[in-house]
């Protein structure tokens, strides 16, 4: 569509992605495999973290990053949701998107956000949020009760790298 896109990427065994830097948001869900990502800001700050199946993370906008497959035997596969279509259609300028000198230090958050630390933002059922940059395994993260969605249902919204791409995890009991 014209706003967001989703791509599936595969990094071969022992492989790595090209280094990238762009102004669009990028949320990554790891479907298979394990590895690491290194992020570097223009002032030389580096952050690295390891991910595996069911990890969820966002690369802070306009930082350099590279993904590495930690297995020499199996590929790593992940889905990447981006707002690239909206930005390229708005600005129609690849130089602006891929070579923009603007920095966004507020998108980095505290250093612990790259290690899975974060902040719970209690709003109302169905709207509770966890703010971080990285979640090691969304299937083992405590969701918040959402009784209005059905008995036993729960949900949690993710704010990743202070971004605007909304995502959530919900557990809805069968038959509700």
List PLM regions with ranges:
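Conserved short histidine dyad/triad with adjacent acidic residue
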Residues: 5-22, 151-155, 165-176
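A short hydrophobic beta-strand segment most commonly corresponding to one strand
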Residues: 27-29, 58, 73-93
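Glycine- and acidic-residue-biased ligand/ion/polar-headgroup-sensing regions
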Residues: 12-13, 22-42, 173-176
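Asparagine-centered strand-capping/turn motif at beta-strand->loop junctions
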Residues: 68-70
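A short, N-terminal "cap"/entry segment at the start of jelly-roll beta-barrel domains
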Residues: 1-2, 95-169
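Short acidic-glycine-tyrosine-enriched beta hairpin
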Residues: 41-62
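A generic "binding-loop/recognition-motif" signal
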Residues: 23, 63-64, 84
């Amino acid at each position: 569509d014209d706003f967001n896109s989703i791509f599936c990427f595969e990094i071969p065994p022992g492989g790595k992605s090209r280094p990238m830097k762009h102004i669009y948001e990028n949320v990554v869900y790891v479907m298979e495999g394990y590895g690491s990502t290194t992020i570097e800001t223009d002032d030389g700050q580096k952050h690295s973290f390891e991910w595996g199946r069911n990890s969820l993370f966002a690369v802070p906008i306009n930082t350099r990053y590279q993904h590495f497959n930690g297995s020499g035997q199996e590929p790593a596969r992940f889905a990447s949701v981006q707002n690239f279509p909206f930005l390229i259609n708005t600005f129609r300028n690849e130089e602006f998107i891929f070579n923009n000198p603007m920095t966004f230090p507020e998108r980095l958050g505290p250093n612990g956000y790259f290690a899975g630390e974060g902040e719970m933002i209690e709003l109302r059922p169905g709207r509770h949020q966890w703010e971080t940059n990285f979640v090691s395994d969304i299937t083992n993260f405590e969701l918040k009760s959402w009784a209005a969605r059905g008995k036993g249902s729960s949900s949690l919204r993710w704010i990743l790298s202070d971004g605007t791409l909304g995502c959530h995890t919900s557990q809805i009991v069968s038959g509700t």
